[in-house]
Amino acid sequence: MSPNRQSQIKVTDDQLKIFLNCSEVFNACDSEDIDFILSQIKTYHYDNETVIAHREDVGDQIRFVIKGSLNIVATSLDGKEVRFPPIGPNRWVGWISCFDIQALSHDWVATSNSDILVIPGTAIRKLCTKNPDLYPKIMAEINRQFKLLMSWTEFVSLHSLSARACMLIHILAQISATPMDNKPGWLQVDVTQEHLASFLNLSRQTANKLLVGLEKDGFINIGYRKILINTAYLNR
């Protein structure tokens, strides 16, 4: 994994406004507020997998994934690495860090060939001071992510391995996947078999056996550094 190597890239205001529209928080802002946010945005490209925020750093910013994904990576005292399901394209993350000065307990890792948009927490707090009606919308964003985390914790702790694997696919569909234009009804998640095993906190052999079972059921297709999810199975 590379150290924090990044290159700043330029994105047009029209493109940035499209990204802002992916959050109900910014949809509630007037044009003056949007212009202010546009002035605060920075966008970065990462050629290689890169740690962009270290545990013990203070977060104080929100991020939007334009391309690639963001991973939460935790490391135990004995050096064991555990990854949580990644944040995929067209999704915002990090709202709670704008109002919490505690240091991170994990690393944020950008996958290779990722483009990530960043807005400082000071800008978000300034928006909320001007327009307190934004607080409930931000709380809704935080609550949505918290509920997913609690669901994942429940399945890892209480349910069978097969149920855990199935729940992982549901979570990936919500926070990681992108629709496939050339294959309607399917979603794509760019992820390695090694990382899937890490999400499940299982050996690669055990995780692969579970995923092959889901593939036989028609729920997913396993490819090279990716899985495809059949949306017809998500509501079953």
Task: Indicate where each model-derived feature is located.
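Cyclic-nucleotide recognition modules
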Residues: 33, 83-147, 151
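Phosphate-/nucleic-acid-contacting segments
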Residues: 174-236
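Short phosphate-coordinating micro-motif centered on Lys-Gly-acidic
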Residues: 52-58
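Polybasic "coupling" helices that flank or enter modular domains
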Residues: 129-199
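A short beta-strand-loop-beta hairpin characteristic of the jelly-roll/cupin
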Residues: 70-82
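Cyclic nucleotide-binding regulatory module and flanking cytosolic helices
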Residues: 1-48, 97-98
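Glycine- and acidic-residue-biased ligand/ion/polar-headgroup-sensing regions
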Residues: 49, 60-73, 89-90
